[in-house]
Design a protein with these regions (language model features):
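Specific transmembrane alpha-helical segments of multi-pass solute transporters/efflux pumps
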Residues: 26-31, 62, 66-107, 113, ...
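Cytoplasmic-side transmembrane-helix entry/capping segments in multi-pass membrane proteins
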Residues: 16-20, 76-86, 131-144, 163-167, ...
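Transmembrane alpha-helices of multi-pass small-molecule transport proteins
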Residues: 34, 42-92, 119-120, 172-180, ...
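Helix-helix packing/entry segments at the starts of transmembrane helices
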Residues: 24-25, 51-52, 90, 94, ...
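Hydrophobic transmembrane alpha-helices of multi-pass small-molecule transport proteins
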Residues: 61, 123, 132-153, 171, ...
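Juxtamembrane helix-entry segments on the extracytoplasmic side of multipass membrane proteins
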Residues: 11-17, 42-51, 74-80, 152-173, ...
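Hydrophobic/aromatic residues within transmembrane alpha-helices
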Residues: 37, 49, 53, 100, ...
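Glycine-/small-residue-enriched transmembrane alpha-helix faces in small-molecule transporters
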Residues: 2-51, 156-183, 204, 306-308
């Protein structure tokens, strides 16, 4: 067998890493827009904002599917799994994340949430993907350490016990979502799966906002513009994330996704003129090292040497 034959496989996985990095960047854009929305005197409730954001993302992806004449429905045999991911995926994860924010600082909640790559590693192993190889473990440790440094630097850490529970529940649900997408969605196009995930999240958050008495539409054009922009960025992020999962699997997707807090910090520096500390630069370097390593690492196979 020629030594050059694996090259297309490596190219596919490199592209997968780039797609996940692009998803992290777009989610960073969403964070910055969300910060700007929260700075107004009477901001739209978070639940309502997220419902509209995910609804816009679903409409954008549906329009893309129609324009490219791709199927709106998932592949046969994957529809039930996609429905479960759509209903219990981003919507439920976001619900617990923002419940946690009511009981702790954003830095503390984000730090706990970014435990999810470890949960992904455990879930992937339980799902039969095997233990990650040494290179992936190194990437995981580097990315998580970097994310922790970025989040903690210059920010207060305070959270109540119930907030810890909510944050870890959010991380666990998101980890299950990533692994479930890796296991279930083999033949469904990324545009299709992203559309239904957005629609499910939008519906779930809409119901929650109504029940909590926190539903309202944006009050002016500025809010509408920001939320629509968030929805468009979310649509692109969903597409890139699904393509990334398909190419590099759930665990390495989780590792590369640690770029998100770094992207948010750098965008805040560019757009909001926030200060970039030495801790952010150090953490960012570790995240980049972990992301690049994860993109280059191969999936664990029976032929690969496993961690003893």
């Amino acid at each position: 067998m020629s030594e050059r034959e694996p090259h297309p496989h490596h190219l596919r996985e490199t592209v997968g890493g780039i797609m996940v990095a692009l998803a992290a960047l777009q989610f960073g854009v969403v964070i910055i827009l969300g910060k700007q929305l929260g700075d107004v005197a009477d901001p739209i409730p978070v639940e309502a904002m997220l419902s509209i954001r995910f609804g816009v993302s679903a409409l954008v992806l549906a329009a893309a599917l129609a324009a490219t004449r791709r199927p709106l429905l998932a592949a046969e045999g994957e529809r039930r799994g996609l429905a479960l991911l759509a209903i219990f995926g981003y919507g439920t994860e976001a619900t617990f994340f923002f419940l946690s924010l009511r009981h702790g600082t954003a830095a503390a909640v984000t730090l706990l949430f970014f435990l999810y790559p470890v949960v992904v590693a455990i879930f992937s192993w339980l799902a039969g993907s095997g233990r990650p190889n040494r290179l992936t473990i190194v990437a995981l440790l580097a990315a998580m350490t970097g994310a922790a440094i970025v989040v903690v630097t210059g920010a207060g850490l305070a959270i109540e016990p119930i907030g810890i529970l909510f944050a870890f529940t959010s991380a666990t649900i998101y980890a299950a979502y990533l692994v479930g997408s890796d296991v279930v969605l083999r033949r469904t196009p990324a545009l299709t799966s992203g559309m239904w995930v957005g629609a499910g999240a939008s519906l779930g958050l809409f119901v929650w906002a109504l029940v909590a008495g926190r539903w309202r539409l944006p009050s002016d054009g500025r809010e509408w513009l920001a939320i629509v922009a968030m929805g468009i960025a979310t649509a692109g992020a969903f597409f890139c994330l699904m393509e990334g999962i398909r190419r590099i699997g759930a665990l390495r997707t989780a590792i590369v996704s640690a770029l998100e807090p770094l992207a948010a910090s750098l965008l805040a520096w560019l757009v909001l003129r926030e200060v970039v500390t030495g801790g952010v630069l150090l953490g960012g370097t570790l995240i980049l090292a972990g992301a690049i390593t994860a993109s280059l690492a191969r999936r664990a196979t029976p032929q690969e040497q496993q961690i003893p």
